[in-house]
A protein has these predicted regions:
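All-alpha amphipathic helical-bundle segments outside canonical DNA-binding/catalytic cores
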Residues: 82-94
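Secondary-structure capping and boundary motifs in well-ordered enzyme cores
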Residues: 4, 31, 94-99, 127
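Short amphipathic alpha-helical segments and their helix-coil junctions
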Residues: 20, 24, 71-84
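ATP/Mg2+ or Mg2+-diphosphate-binding catalytic cores
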Residues: 100-167
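Active-site activation/catalytic loop segments of kinase-like enzymes and analogous catalytic loops
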Residues: 36-79, 96-115
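Loop/helix-junction capping segments adjacent to catalytic residues or to phosphate/diphosphate-binding pockets
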Residues: 33, 84, 100
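Hydrophobic side chains within alpha-helical segments
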Residues: 8-11, 41, 103, 134
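Active-site acidic catalytic loop and adjacent metal/ATP-binding pocket
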Residues: 1-37, 50
Length: 167
């Protein structure tokens, strides 16, 4: 499959005056890859209430209601691409990607901030902590998130003109 490779919220173009995404930008990362990686990363980024550089906040860091809303839109537009095996692993993929990114930020901090651009001291260390908190938030909510996902895909939906996957 062809994936975007960096589907974070900053790479989603939103229509002016509307609450609707119209395009993904920053296409230099388009490549063959796994749908779960792309969709998991998109959900990790878009459902993080604080963003990668966020400060302390109240409540769960991972927004379950955004997770459900984003997946409802995905289901209606391209849900046929997400097979049963993908759905079974989707929440786990979001959690795994948050942990992976936390490790990448932490490693970059230890290496002298060579990969991710920083504007202040210890910014990548802070970013790592945010991703690890996000990981913990997803873990605490894993069962309810899986229930939301199952409920969304149990409903009937309009047919998609997308190519079918073999899963």
């Amino acid at each position: 499959e062809v994936i975007h490779g960096d589907p974070k919220s900053a790479n989603v173009l939103v229509a002016a005056g509307e609450n609707r995404a119209i395009a993904l930008i920053d296409l230099d990362t388009v490549k063959p890859g796994l749908l779960l990686h792309d969709l998991g990363d998109c959900l990790r980024s878009c459902c993080n209430r604080l963003g990668e550089d966020g400060e302390e906040g109240e409540g769960e860091l991972f927004a379950a209601e955004l997770f459900q809303a984003l997946l409802a839109g995905y289901r209606d537009a391209a849900g046929d691409l997400l097979g049963m095996a993908d759905r079974a692993l989707l929440v786990e993929s979001v959690r795994l990607i948050s942990y992976e990114l936390g490790l990448r930020f932490f490693t970059d901090h230890l290496a002298g901030d060579r990969y991710f651009t920083v504007t202040r001291p210890a910014q990548n260390l802070h970013r790592a902590a945010v991703q690890f908190r996000l990981h913990a938030s997803i873990l605490r909510q894993q069962e309810p998130l899986e229930e939301r996902l199952a409920h969304l895909f149990a409903r009937t939906r309009p047919p998609c003109n997308c190519p079918r996957r073999g899963l």
